[in-house]
Amino acid sequence: MPIGADLVLHEQANPTAIVIDGQALGKVVEETARRYGTPLAFAHMDLQLEKAVLLEILGIPVTDIPLYHFSGDPGAEAVTRVREALGKPLNPALQAHIDSVAYIAQKTDLVPIGMTIGPFSLMTKLLKDPITPIYLAGSGMTADDDPDVALVDRALELSLLIVLHSVAAQIRAGAKAIFMAEPAANIVYVSPKQIEAGSDIFERYPIGADRRVKALLQQHGVDLIFHCCGELNDYMVRQFCTLEPVILSLGSSRKLWEDARIVPKDIVLFGNLPSKHFYSDAVITRAQVEQLACELFHRMAEAGHPFILGSECDVLNVPDSTAVIRDKVDAFVRCQCDGSRVVQA
């Protein structure tokens, strides 16, 4: 099963108009689920959406938003400004995103799955260099000690505010689960050496913020589907499991049959075919996709862990490569895995 709404969206004549039209976007989500034979209707993934909404509220020109980063702590007044703005009519794209969830809930027999970026990953998009201050925080420095640590803390506070608002709105729209993509919670942004030395930085920053989202979901009886396609170690995977997701989606760098040893069996593993590379036959061919799908299918069967064969992340459209990508998605969705192509260890 792919997370493929973006691919289907860009098959349409007017994708830019669709993403601000909730019913039209909902129909794209519905078409995606029905095409790939799944009852799970995953909302469109746009990991720039919440950043755009947040910075628009703070008065950043629309044309500057994609490359914009805070140069310093915007202060407590920024938090107040965002909180007040979220009580007013929403950004058209965010409203359409929420309305697409409502369309699935009200107009179809599919299971509506909401979508959000994780607060930690959103924070990293707001800073030019998030790695250094995260490291400083992991070494014990606080916002009072260093202005860059103060900036990380403020950016995370703002990120959590917008994510919680989006998730709450999607819950009201009828979402039965929320897919939270937290790709930056990985060994690039958080030092494994600091963790090994006893730092609680991973728990304090990504996991601590994610627990706030999880608490909101629990309050409303909504499930968490957690995704991270970044480079991870086993400690990080175990920490993700403490969030008690019903599904854990990991990137292609992980061997899911090995992760099955550390992930509780009440958490379904999802993935993790390298869909980021489907755009190029020079990187991966259709035949290789089929082989990887068969190998993963059979290794997971041997592991005896609940599993959904899927893409490692959402399958993004790449201009001029749409047909190639779609062909590889079809290859693993419709692959008849008989075990003959399983690679022997």
Where are these regions (language model features)?
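Active-site loop segments of alpha/beta catalytic cores
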Residues: 1-7, 15, 93-345
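Active-site-flanking structural segment that lines cofactor/substrate pockets
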Residues: 4-37
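Glycine-rich loop at the start of a catalytic domain that most often binds anionic cofactors/ligands
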Residues: 11, 48-63
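Solvent-exposed, flexible loop/coil residues
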Residues: 22-23, 74, 277
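Catalytic domains of carbohydrate-active enzymes, especially glycoside hydrolases
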Residues: 25-47, 168-177, 239-246
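A short acidic, glycine/proline-enriched capping/turn motif at secondary-structure boundaries
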Residues: 47-50, 119-121
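A gly/proline- and charged-residue-enriched helix-loop-helix capping module
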Residues: 63-106
